[in-house]
Amino acid sequence: MSRVGKKPVPVPAGVTATVTGQTVKMKGSKGELSFVVPALVNVAMKDGAIEVQPVNQSKPARSLWGTSRAQIANIAEGVSKGFEKKLEITGVGYRAAMAGKALKLSLGYSHDIEYAIPAGITIATPKPTEITISGINRQQVGQVAAEIREYRGPEPYKGKGVKYAGEFIFRKEGKKK
């Protein structure tokens, strides 16, 4: 029995939700998102909340039950509040700046990296060593943050590189003589 799936998804104030067949659409102050629920899961609107139930008690249906509920909850939060991820850049000469519709990263390579910002994502650089990624789609915000971090992930010896804000980097000691 899925503990996540059992709880209905409350529709936040200021958000309109519609359920047509297997599609859940939500519209809020930040934008509009939709999610197609897998066929192994039933979805219905009851008392201002969205309820998710598995079609049967098979393993795949029960697996998708909690996942579908979490996806719908993320859509509800995204269209009302939005999502944000912060990245920190550590290292001498490592910096980030906005260049039109792209993010320009100087990460110690012989060339600068131009990252094209996808639609639906807003990137800001309050400081040259900070990047703020925001949007309404949680998966997309996390994916963009992971792609930027991948260009120069934090290394364990000096801690240089791009890391998530608040991320702990396991440090190693250099070799001894």
From Swiss-Prot:
InterPro entries attached to this UniProt entry: Ribosomal_uL6-like, Ribosomal_uL6-like_a/b-dom_sf, Ribosomal_uL6_a/b-dom, Ribosomal_uL6_bac-type, Ribosomal_uL6_CS
Alphabetized Gene3D superfamilies for the sequence: Ribosomal protein L6, alpha-beta domain
GO cellular component: cytosolic large ribosomal subunit
Cytoplasm recorded as keyword: no
Coiled-coil annotated residue ranges, if any: none
MF annotations from Gene Ontology: rRNA binding; structural constituent of ribosome
Pfam families according to UniProt: Ribosomal_L6
Keywords from the named record: Ribonucleoprotein, Ribosomal protein, RNA-binding, rRNA-binding
Top-level division of the source organism's lineage: Bacteria
GO biological process entries: cytoplasmic translation
UniProt record similarity statement: Belongs to the universal ribosomal protein uL6 family.
Subunit field text: Part of the 50S ribosomal subunit.
Task of the protein: This protein binds to the 23S rRNA, and is important in its secondary structure. It is located near the subunit interface in the base of the L7/L12 stalk, and near the tRNA binding site of the peptidyltransferase center.
Name of the protein described by the UniProt record: Large ribosomal subunit protein uL6
The encoding gene: rplF
